Structure formats: C-alpha cells, structure tokens
C-alpha cells in the first residue's frame, strides 16, 4: 500500500494565544483564479494565484528538468461559498464565541475589496475595526475537482483549501490550517476509503470532511479542551 501524505497541516505564530480571542468575523473565502501566474505574497497571506506543492494535482506544475508545464483547474465560486458556510457553522456552534457571519463581515468592505484588489490582511483590519472583533477568519479554496463516475468506480474528487486567522490590529496571520485530499482507492488508503463509506465521494462531501478536520484543530472557543498548538515555525507564516 502507498504512503498517504498528511491531509491537514497546521501552523501557528508564536504570538497566538487562543484564550485572548472571544469574538470572530468570518469573511467569504476566495478562490484560485485561472489562468494566473505566480506572484509574491502580500502581508503574510498568499495571493489566490499562488499554488504550493501540496496543492498540485497529478499532471500539474511538473518539472522534468527542461520543461515546466502549468495547468490550472477552475475553482467554482459556489465551492468557496459552501466551505465558508461550513466554517462559519462550526464556529457558531462554539458557545463561548461571538461569531459574525460572512454576509455582515463582507458588507464592511463590499465592492471596494474587488475594485482595489484588497489584500486579505487589509480587509481583516477594516472588518475587525468596524465590527470590533478579536480575530478575522478568512480562507482560500485552491482545488475543487468533482468526482467523475459513480461511487464504486470513478476519477476521484480532489479538494484543497486554507483557513487563516488574522489579527485585526496589524493584519498578522496568527494561525493557518491547510487541507488537501485527492481521494485514494482502497489499496492506497484503507482508513481514508472506509472513512468515506467505502466508496468514492463527491467534492462536496470531501470538502465537508476537510472542514471538520481543519476546524477540529482550530483551538479558538474550545477553552482548555482545545487541541495543542504546533511548535512555532521559524519561517514566515505563508
């Protein structure tokens, strides 16, 4: 059986203290725009067109020593909307948190964010100051490929997204949760295959499973029962 890479990766800044956050605003998640070329990061949060290695699907961004072919997959806006709602729903279920949903949060910046291509940290600062919250949750959907075929035999679905917790006072990314999974067949991922009912699931189901896994690792609003934070990474939070 093949080796299955981690489906969830977590990073936390040394300054992150979950106990200091009792209110959150959730911004609508962004999507990868295609076709795009990679560009440098802004303010600690990667631009939507930047694709990291773990979020490349088979056959994309492969280097053979002389050629470097880039193929991009279209991520539908409906996928970002669905994942945003799922994240907001999980957070709203934590009684100790005051959560402001994506509609009210986005109304603070509205069309201005699209017209000026406003970076996420800047949006978070404006939203946080206006709504008077301790943190702003934002995200990026990098991959959303639907299953082709039936549950019993198919080209599997693939979903990849990131969740950011941003400090409104200065736009710093305090916590990042990343999820990517292209469902594997039984002989490559026994646990994962039966976790999904013993068949190939849709992208919507895979996304819901991913949100649950990432948010299980999100310690805000869980008190002392929250998951331990990972050791701070010496590199800049992406």
Model-predicted segments: where are they?
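C-terminal/domain-edge helix-coil "capping" segments
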Residues: 3-25, 30-37, 127-131, 153-156, ...
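Short structured motifs
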Residues: 10-11, 122-124, 147
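Generic short beta-strand segments
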Residues: 29, 140-146
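N-terminal segment of the mature soluble domain
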Residues: 34-140, 168-176, 209-218, 222
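Short catalytic/ligand-binding loop motif for oxyanion handling, primarily in non-cytosolic enzymes
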Residues: 34-35, 145-147
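Generic structural signal for helix capping and beta-alpha/helix-loop junctions
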Residues: 107-109, 145, 183
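Short beta-alpha junctions and helix-cap segments that line functional grooves
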Residues: 148-152
């Amino acid at each position: 059986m093949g080796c299955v890479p981690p489906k969830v990766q977590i990073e936390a800044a040394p300054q992150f203290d979950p106990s200091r956050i009792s209110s959150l605003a959730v911004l609508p998640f962004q999507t990868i725009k295609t076709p795009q070329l990679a560009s440098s990061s802004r303010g600690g949060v990667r631009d939507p067109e930047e694709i990291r290695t773990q979020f490349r699907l088979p056959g994309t961004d492969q280097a053979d020593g002389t050629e470097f072919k880039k193929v991009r997959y279209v991520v539908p806006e409906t996928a970002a909307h669905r994942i945003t709602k799922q994240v907001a729903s999980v957070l709203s279920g934590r009684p100790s948190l005051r959560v402001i949903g994506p509609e009210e949060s986005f109304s603070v910046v509205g069309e201005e964010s699209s017209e000026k291509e406003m970076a996420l940290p800047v949006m978070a600062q404006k939203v946080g100051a206006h709504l008077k919250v301790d943190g702003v949750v934002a995200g990026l959907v990098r991959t959303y490929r639907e299953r082709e075929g039936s549950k019993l035999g198919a080209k599997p679905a693939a979903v990849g997204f990131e969740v950011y917790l941003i400090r409104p006072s200065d736009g710093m990314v305090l916590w990042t949760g990343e999820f990517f999974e292209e469902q594997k067949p039984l002989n490559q991922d026994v646990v994962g295959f039966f976790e999904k009912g013993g068949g190939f699931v849709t992208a919507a189901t895979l996304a819901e499973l991913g949100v649950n896994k990432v948010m299980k690792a999100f310690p805000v609003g869980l008190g002392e029962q929250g998951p331990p934070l990972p050791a701070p990474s010496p590199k800049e939070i992406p």
